[in-house]
Amino acid sequence: MRRIAVVGAGQAGLHLALGLRPDSTGAAGPSGPHELQEPYDVTVYTARTPDQVRAGRVLSTQVMYGPALALERAAGLHLWEAEAPRLTALGFSVADPQRSPGGGFAGPLDQPAQSVDLRVKTADWLELFEARGGRVEYGTVGPDDLPGIAAAHDLTVVASGHGPLAEVFARDARHSPYERPQRRLAVCYVRGTRMPDGLDGPHLRVTPVGGSKELAGEFFVMHALTLDGPCEIVLWEAVPGGPFDVWSDRPGPGEVVERTLELLRGHLPGEYELCRGMEPTDAGAALTGALTPVVRRPVAEVAPGAHVLGLGDAVVLHDPIGGQGSNSAARGAAHYLRAIAAHGGEPFDRTWMLRTFAAYWEHARHVSAFCNMLLGPPPEHVRRILSAAARHPAVAHRYANGFGDPAGFADWFMDADRADAYLAAVGAAGAAVPADGG
């Protein structure tokens, strides 16, 4: 039996590890044409036990769209289908610097999205992995531990996207346009928000704030499942130095809610009315910080002739503005799983690792480009698209469903000529663009 190590127990690492340890019915085999001939001997390395994860703070917002959820279902891993709210629409509105109402739209999702608190998912998946006979080594793993782990396994996959472990993979400057964080982030899981007009069920909505030349940031609200049931999540994407950049002292959940309401009262009074009754779900409900989007070289040599392969955030880290972190993690894990199954008994050498990542990158590069575009002031053609979406339901529908697979945005959203050709084809050409950039 071939031995595989997975270092990191997040969305990507556990999806891969569980796929390599299918249950006795075979229900959790990999999607795609290649099925596992037999389970692998898999060890997951992670710092925290399931109970410690559940007792800790939230980790992300993790809205997963239909295509990524389908990968979990195919692997028998979507355990919260009936419990998690089904997000059926993406709402988009605009607030200008004078705080006057702006244009907006709601695009229905063809396949509902869902968000499951990663504390719930990680803890449940760790327990499921051990129940299937997988081994978990609990404790901190650093770069100095990788040579020993790699020597003891046929393949070592590093799926930890933060801290020293991620740094073993060299930054790829060709695909990493940013050298510092573009947003300061604040997340809080809450209850007590109200539905806006036009959205009568669970959804995700976003309001960018700022003019055509300068953004202040974005405010998100989405429905989710947390430790004790359904909830809402609020997220600030604050441009550094702007009016929403008030999180450097890393406040707790109560203070995040208090500051959020102060910001909403002054900048988004409509959202303030919807959120004024919210309260944190628990003592670990808040997360603040910042990250720099980056693409890293996928293979690292940790000892002479010993290589490890990066997965998920370890090698392609997106800002959460595009909502693609967990979606990309699931897609990457499923791709690696198929590649491992197809490789049979051949060695997992550097050539195989590079080839495996290169095939994944053919899709991931589009996701990275999309998320990076969202971090800057919207180009003129994007402003035309969003303005048209407020008046043409077909445009709103296509935009909303594009988040399920952002590679499709390359066909229209990412290119001015293609965008204008699409708008003309659906009768939305010439849509007025508000002076405030909405």
Segment roles from a protein language model:
Residues 1-12:
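Beta1/beta-strand and adjacent pyrophosphate-binding region of the FAD-binding site
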Residues 6, 289-368:
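Conserved mid-domain beta->alpha element of the FAD-binding
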Residues 7-9, 18-56:
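Glycine-rich FAD pyrophosphate-binding loop
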Residues 48-95:
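N-terminal FAD cofactor-binding segment of flavoenzymes
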Residues 60-63, 108-124, 159, 165-166, ...:
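Short beta-strand to alpha-helix junction loop
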Residues 169-210:
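Central beta-strand plus flanking loop segment that forms part of the substrate or channel wall
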Residues 211-286:
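Conserved FAD/dinucleotide-binding core of flavoprotein oxidoreductases
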Residues 322, 338-438:
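C-terminal helical "tail/cap" subdomain of flavin- and related membrane-associated enzymes
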